[in-house]
Amino acid sequence: MDTSTILVATDLSARSADIVQKALPLAHKLNAKLHVVHIIEEKIFTYLDDADTLLEKAQNALEKLFPHIPKEQLHCQKGKISSSVAALANNLDAKLVILGSSGENGGLKSLFVGSSTKDIVRSLTMPALVVKTTNDLHVDKLLIPTDFSEASRWHIHAMRSLFPEAKITLLHTFVVPFSSRLSLYGVKKGDVNLLEENLYTNAKNKAALFMQNLNDDSNQVDIIVREGGLDAGVFTGIANMHGIQTISLHTTGSISLFAFDLLLETDKDVIINIV
């Protein structure tokens, strides 16, 4: 079996060090080498004369934090954090980049001084797993929103390739156009209900065709169709009902804006795949 690479970005905090420790069993499960990177924001060097000493001390801090990881898999660099993480991930041909989120109560603030998780995610060409929970990493169950697009199909296959043993639950939502206004316009409740039933039937038919065209193991992928918008609270609630810790999204079509909103609001771990 070929060995792949997982890259974890760390700011040397206790929280991010804990994420590295949690990434180790995931890397083992996926037969992947775990690399760790710390980027020193380049602007820091404008205030210091001895850049080499700072880099050396940061490298030593990495090695002290993670003595069980081979030194050649620990990287300390200077530069713009988002582009530097992305460049190293590309050079390593990483299949997954793992990031931590900071801030109280699941709020997403700066991951590093001068850079944000969103900036890093947008710079990547591979999936990013943003860790928001304090639990061990669990990717055996994934919740994925789908709009039945080709990009969505590609994303699902990408997740199946990355996590071949994962049980995937797809979620498709539909909305009744102008539902809050229809009664004001004199539309009877029975007619509104009939419209909703027709839209639901249409969505279920599209879901069945989409599942058929996935050419995947039906025991590993199922789908939920429900009325409503892509709301982070509802989405997180569905994840809770199904015992799912990790939500996975791609960033095109109707999912695009929702991806980063969900990243802000949910208390679940989130995989974002730039398509």
Stretch-by-stretch model annotation:
Residues 54-60, 190-202:
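A short acidic, glycine-rich active-site loop
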